[in-house]
Regions:
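Amphipathic alpha-helical recognition patches that constitute DNA-binding helices
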Residues: 1, 23, 45
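Short hydrophobic/aromatic-rich motifs at helix boundaries and adjacent loops
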Residues: 1, 14-15, 33-35
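Enriched for short, Lys/Arg-rich terminal
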Residues: 8-22, 40, 53-62, 66-83
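Short, well-structured alpha-helical segments
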Residues: 21, 25-29
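A short, surface-exposed loop/turn module that caps and links secondary-structure elements
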Residues: 29-56
Length: 83
C-alpha cells in the first residue's frame, strides 16, 4: 500500500532511474519476507516520526514506511525523511 506521496515517488523512479526502482522493489520484497524490522537496507525507527521506519535505498534516498499487523504503507521512497 502507498500514500499519495509514496506512490508519486515510486512512479518517478519508474521513469527516471530503473536501478533505484529495482532497489526499492528489493527492499519491499525484504519487508514482506523478513518483516518490517529485519532485512536489507538497515531498517531503523524514525525518532522524529512516531510509528515510522526507514530503509536505505542509497546514500541520498530512503524508503519510509509504517506498518500494522496486516498492512505496510509506503509513505516515501525518495529524499531523506521528507514530509
Amino acid at each position: 500500500m502507498f500514500t499519495e506521496i509514496g506512490f508519486s515517488h515510486y512512479i518517478y523512479w519508474q521513469t527516471q532511474d530503473k536501478k533505484t526502482l529495482q532497489k526499492i522493489n528489493k527492499l519491499l520484497k525484504s519487508i514482506s519476507r523478513e518483516g518490517p524490522l529485519e532485512g536489507e537496507g538497515k531498517p531503523e525507527r524514525l525518532k522524529h516520526k512516531e510509528g515510522e521506519y526507514s530503509r536505505r535505498i542509497d546514500s541520498e534516498n530512503r524508503l519510509v514506511y509504517e506498518f500494522s499487523e496486516e498492512t505496510i504503507t509506503v509513505k516515501a521512497c525518495g529524499g531523506h525523511y521528507e514530509e
